[in-house]
Each structure stands twice: as structure tokens, then as C-alpha cells.
Amino acid sequence: MSGSKKKKVTKAERLKLLQEEEERRLKEEEEARLKYEKEEMERLEIQRIEKEKWHRLEAKDLERRNEELEELYLLERCFPEAEKLKQETKLLSQWKHYIQCDGSPDPSVAQEMNTFISLWKEKTNETFEEVIEKSKVVLNLIEKLKFILLETPPCDLQDKNIIQYQESILQLQELLHLKFGVATEILLKQASTLADLDSGNMEKVIKDENVTLYVWANLKKNPRHRSVRFSETQIGFEIPRILATSDIAVRLLHTHYDHVSALHPVSTPSKEYTSAVTELVKDDVKNVEKAISKEVEEESKQQERGSHLIQEEEIKVEEEQGDIEVKMSSAEEESEAIKCEREMKVLSETVSAAQLLLVENSSEKPDFFEDNVVDLCQFTTLGGVYHLDILELPPQCKPVKGWMIVEILKEGLQKYTYPPETTEEFETENAFPPIEVTLEVHENVIFFEDPVVVRWDAEGKHWRTDGISNVSYKPKERLVTFSLDTFGPVTLIQDAHINMPYQSWELRPLDVNKVLLTVTTVFTEIQIQIKENLCMLSSIKLKDKKHISILEGTWMTPIPFIIALKEAGLNIFPTRHSHFYVIINNKVPLVEVKAYRQMALLSSAFAFGWSKWNLLCNSTKVVFKVREHLTEACTENPNWALLMFSGDRAQRLKIKEESEAFSEALKEETEFHSTLYHMVKDFASEEAMEKVRSSNCQFVNSVCHMLLSTRLLSYS
């Protein structure tokens, strides 16, 4: 029994076990320490080698920096060259307009505009059709004035010119609306002769590409006739009994443009930036003048030496004079070259200032808006303005002995006040209910969400959301129905940043001097083709379905193209205030500008794409994908490289788009470069680089403008 019992461990044995365990622990700790020290030494050695390699690469980059920047400067001459071509085209256009003598004014000349406006004011008794025809000229002039304000580099725009152009725009807008009012009065005076045989009331629809007029005159005053629907449309009104029994006319003037909202302020560069650019230009001018004066001095010295030799030796005089003439001729040529260089330098600075302004974020948020007031920096009006008016029916034309007699009212067409200012004589509370209105959304406008109906507050000079109720929208029929407390201008608005931030983007070559820019958003995929100085909407996809737009297939210069896309509801163009309304991946403006300029330079032979790592690097750096793209076969098997660019340094990253974590580590066997051009040159074919060097300057400038306008690196 005692043998079955467990043997008792003695104190000495227990101490021995503890000692062995302690020795084992100390040995393991020592081994771990030695292993850690070894690993740490290896890590530090690797770090030292990497640091040395990094410093060597930095030194090499610094050594060739000036050379690379000089080469980039020569390539970037395409931007001032494109600007010079644009200016020459503008002058040629002005000259053609001058020799045409077609009677239309030059919108940039105040005297011509004032004469045009005065002459049209004097013209009376124009029919609606005549005003519509004239409106085409007026709208074209307004468009030209807006383009002048947008296309002229900010440094070249003087305050007095801005005021002049904006005043001309406002005068034309006001006069055009006044003319439509007078033409409506002339039309309504003939209401009785245009009456419908069935209803006895007058109904008229006049359609044009820019304006649509719907007018209804209540001649019979039938209290049961309260539903007004214009023929072959669902557009109309449900009017209350009091209006159905009154001498009134209801007018819906749908202008496919917005002349009600205030004009957008013209962006101008900050004083600090303007002064910096001015100083740069002044320095260049001084340097050039010094160089020219030095040459003149040298020429005069040569002439003095020549005259001295004349006195000594007549034979040598002729030879010396010949030499002097040659030298003077070459000096003149050099002087001309210096002047040309100075002009290009000034143009280059002007273009750079304008480009930087496109990516500048405003430091101040737009003024505070009270409840129900629309902030037009956050929202945009779409589809034009619907001018809704209840008018007093003017005296009708009456046939008397072969003559048409009509009473002419001095005050002209009068609006019918509804509801009246005093309602004491009316007993029932709901004697003046809101008027139900049904409108058709313009066919060329895309709403990604149900449109919001707003009304114009003439007193406060802004759009408001109150006073409108029971709004419903039928997307298939494109009809919006709502109830309106009082008549006046109404419009439809949409969040201006509904397609921002973008989900992804890609820029790839299509042909010689032709690229395709694809921007993918939550709601749509927009494809834009760019060639020479033109842009075209290639396609729109809505929820994987192709959408047909009137803009597709139409080539336009960049600024009119951007305006057309915005007016169609396809806004992928941030403003200087957009960062207040969109969560963005903000980048330093100068880094953005440098990246877009150099991407544009390479765009004829290289494709660029969105990278998720651009979100994880700081605001002083941008990351994007790039690959050589000479044939469509490149699209099938894309082999993207990841580049990081800080404006002063470009490097190829070791990580891939599919990697798990972000790292700025350099890809093996690659180097730093001061420009993107020299970075891609390391892995590009000679054919690709030759294609880049022979790119059309207008094409490069257009691609750059589109990149600056979409701000893909900050808004993706």
C-alpha cells in the first residue's frame, strides 16, 4: 500500500528543479536578446543602406534637376503658344466681324452695344415671333460677353471692362424680357379673334429653340371651366373659381435660359499672387532691356573702332564696315529673338496665373442664408425659368366698318394681383387657394434626383423654397406638379455637387492628339473626347444604361463645352466654393497644377488613372496610375505603374494598387526625377516619347484645361 503512494518530492529536489527552470529561462532570455540584437543590427544595417541609397538618389536627382527643368520648360512652351494662337484667332474673328458689316455689334465695344440697345428700344409693335427672332441675336451677344469674361486670362481683365460687360449683359436681359411682355400684350389684344371655337377662350402655344410661350385668355368667364390644359400637352393649371370668372389671361413663358438669377462673380487672382506674377514679369523685362542695351553699346563701340581705322587705313575701312553691318544685322535678329522670348515669358506667366486660379479654394464660405433661401453656390438652376403670370385681359380689338378699333392703355400690360392685397370683403377663409401648376421638365436636362421647385423673391433678389406645396414628379413623363401661393418666376434646382466626389477616373489616348476622359460618379459615367482645341461628350451611362444627350457628337471649345454640360445637369466641374459642400481629398494647388500640366503633356502616349492611394498620401503629394498606351491592345492587358508626385519630385512606388498598406518605398531599380516626363521616360519606349514631343500645343492645352476644371486629384 505504501508502494502505491506517490513519492514525496524533497526540498532539495524542488530547489534543483527551480534552479534548472531559472537557468533555462535565463538561457532563453539571452538567446532572445542576442536574436533581437542581431535582427536590430540587421534592420539598422538595411536602414543605413536604404538611407545611403536614398541620399545617393536624392543627390543624383539634384545634380540633373536644372537640366530636367530646362527640358520641361521647353516642352511647356506649348501653353503660351496655345494662348498666342487663341489671341490670334480672337483678333481674326473680330476682323471678320468688322468686314462682314452685318449690323450686329461687337459685344466688347461699349459704344456699339449702346447703339444696338437704343435702336431696339425705339422699335415698337413687334409681334412675339419677331421678338423671338431678334432674341437669337441678343442671346448670342449675351453668350459672347459671358465667354469673354470666362476666357480672358484674369490678369488681362480690368475692373472697368468687367463692369462694362456685366452691365451690357443685364441691359440685354432686361430689354429682352420687356420686349416679350410688350409682344404678349399685342397678342392678348387679339384674343377675341383667336378664340377657340369649342371653349370660346383663347389658347396659344408658340415654340422655339430658346423660348416657349403658353398663353390662355379667359373670354367666356365660365365658373365651371377651371382646368386649363394646353393642346397636345399635359402642361396647364387648375385655377380657383374667382379667377375662372375674371377678365384675366394666364401666361407661362418658359425661357430655356436663366436671366433671373444674379450673374456669377468673375474670379480674379489674389493681390499676393498678382503682385508675385507682376514682379516676375517686371524682372524679365528688366533683364531683356539690359541685354538689348548691352548689345547696342557693343555695336557703338564697334562703330567707333571702325571710324578710327578709317583715318589710319582706307583699305581696311571697307572690310571693317562690312563686318560691322553683318554684326549689326545679327544683333538685330538676336534683339528680335529676345523680344519674342520676353513675349512668350509674359504669356507663360499669364497662363500659369489663370491655371492656378482654376484650382484655388475660397477661404470664405458664401454669405449666411436664412431658412428657405437657396444658396446658388450649393444648388444650380436647371432647364431654364418658367415665368408664371396672371394678367389683366387688355381691351379687345373690335371690327367697326372695316376697321379694327382697340383701346390703348398708357400703362401697358398689367398683372392681376392674386391673392388681392386686402381680402376683408371675401367671407370664406379659402377664397384664394393655391393654384395647381403642371410643368414639363426640359428634355435636354438630366435630374439624378427629383427636382426641387423654387420661386423667385423679387424683393430679396433670391430663390426661395417656401410658398410651394404638394410637389410631385413623374420621371417617365418628365412632369412636375405643385401648388403655388402666388404667381411669379419659378425654376427647378438640383444639388450642384450631386456627382462629387467622383468614384474613379481615367484619361487614355485614342489617336494622334486625341484622348478620352472617363469620370465615374455615384449616378453616372461620363466620357469626354478631347482633340486639338475641342471637346465632345462621347457618352453618358445612367445606372448601366446608355443615355442619349443632345450634346453627344457636338465639338466645342473647352469653356462653352463646360457651360453646356453644367446646363444639362452634368456638373463635374468644382468651383472655388465647392470644398464647403463636398468632402474632398484636398491637395496643395501648385502641386495639382503641376501634375495636370505634365499629365496633359504626356497624354498623347500615356494613360492615367485613379488610385486609392491618393487618399492616403498627404496634401503635398498626389498618387495616380500610369502606363504607356500606343495601341488598343494596351487596354486589354493594362500594366499600371504607380507614381507619386510632389510638384518637385516624381517617383515610382513599390506598392501596387492591390497592396494591403500604403508605403512611399521606391520601386527597385528606379530613381527620383524632377518631372513626370523624365520619370516615365525611364520605362517608356522611344516611340511613345517621340509622340509626346510632337503633340499639338492646342491639344495639350485643352487636356490641361479639362483636368484643371474637373480637379480629378482633389475631388476623387
UniProtKB/Swiss-Prot annotation:
Ubiquitinated. Ubiquitination leads to its degradation through the 26S proteasome. Ubiquitin-proteasome-mediated DNAI7 degradation occurs in mitosis. The keyword Ubl conjugation applies. Via its association with the multisubunit axonemal dynein complex, is potentially involved in the regulation of cilia function. May also act as a cell cycle regulator. Signal peptide: none annotated. GO terms for cellular component: axonemal dynein complex; axoneme; cilium. Keywords: Cell projection, Cytoplasm, Ubl conjugation. The gene is DNAI7. PANTHER family: DYNEIN AXONEMAL INTERMEDIATE CHAIN 7 (PTHR20929:SF11), LUNG ADENOMA SUSCEPTIBILITY 1-RELATED (PTHR20929). Its main location: other. It is found in: Cell projection, Cilium; Cytoplasm. It comes from the Eukaryota. One of its GO terms (molecular function) is microtubule binding. Belongs to the DNAI7 family. This is Dynein axonemal intermediate chain 7. Part of the multisubunit axonemal dynein complex formed at least of two heavy chains and a number of intermediate and light chains. Interacts with tubulin. Associates with microtubule.
